[in-house]
Amino acid sequence: MTTNKKDDKITKIDINTNIDITDFIDTKYKSYVFYVLENRALPRLTDGLKTTSRKILNATFKGSLKNGEQKKLLNLAGDTMNLSLYAHGDSSLNSGIATLCQPFSFLFHPLYSDGQVGSLRDPKAAASPRYLTVKQSKYADLWKTDYDLLRFEEDEGQIVE
């Protein structure tokens, strides 16, 4: 299934229907590529965050990590999936949380972990998520988003960013 953001219609392709490959690339694939570029791959100008990072921080500010409490990274990932309707794999979400904990990835990193979240040499070499605990860093309040700047949509009957 692909979506076309211009008219917000979902186009279903039946597997039994023959489609010309040039027509498919010119219409469906191009709309998918532009959707990924606009909504997932590039950081937004409003806050400099990609969608995954924004959803993680949104979950922490909605109450998942209030008052300096500490949580297992897997629990924060579950809260993010629940509160922000994160529909992609949990491994990419775990990697995104570990990236937000890395002091070398952000000038003011929003989350803190006292475990191994990667290094400059290998930023993806974080410890297993079940061993990592995370909490909001002292810079977390700097990352609170001005919600008037964001576009909200309805997904599964819930309003999400």
Give short role names for the model-derived ranges.
Residues M1-E161:
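Catalytic phosphate-handling regions of large nucleic-acid enzymes and associated NTPases
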